[in-house]
Design a protein with these regions (language model features):
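A structural boundary signal for the start of the first folded domain, especially the loop/turn
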Residues: 1-118
Length: 118
């Protein structure tokens, strides 16, 4: 059984689809119990390399037992856009993760990246 119920899954999927259709950015959301002893940043980096991510692929990796997370976004996704990754991490994703609001964290990440070029 996953960490998202059917309604949460649908809400996250809608946000990810809207981001991809509108901006061409594919946000991969991964929920794992833990990062296997790795720092969240390193775990996400390894996943990106192993999965052959492109410049339009971002990742939100959440360790639900931690809780901990890593939000990795290539520069190509944010260049020319008013996107503050640190604010998205600190003010939107982190509070949701630490309240165990897994769907809210993913939706916040997708909405934070869904910004038109400035």
């Amino acid at each position: 059984m996953g960490v998202l119920g059917p309604l949460e899954y649908d809400a996250v999927n809608r946000a990810l689809t809207r981001l991809y259709n509108g901006r061409g950015t594919r946000l991969w959301v991964v929920y794992v119990p833990n990062f296997g002893g790795l720092k969240p940043f390193k775990w996400a980096e390894n996943a990106m390399v192993a999965s052959n991510f492109t410049d339009s692929d971002a990742i939100l990796a959440i360790a639900t037992d931690g809780p901990a997370f890593s939000f990795r976004v290539p520069n190509a996704v944010i260049t020319g856009k008013a996107i503050d990754l640190e604010m998205i991490r600190r003010d939107r994703i982190s509070p949701a993760v630490f309240r165990h609001e897994w769907a809210r964290a993913a939706i916040a990440a997708a909405q934070g990246l869904d910004v038109a070029p400035s």
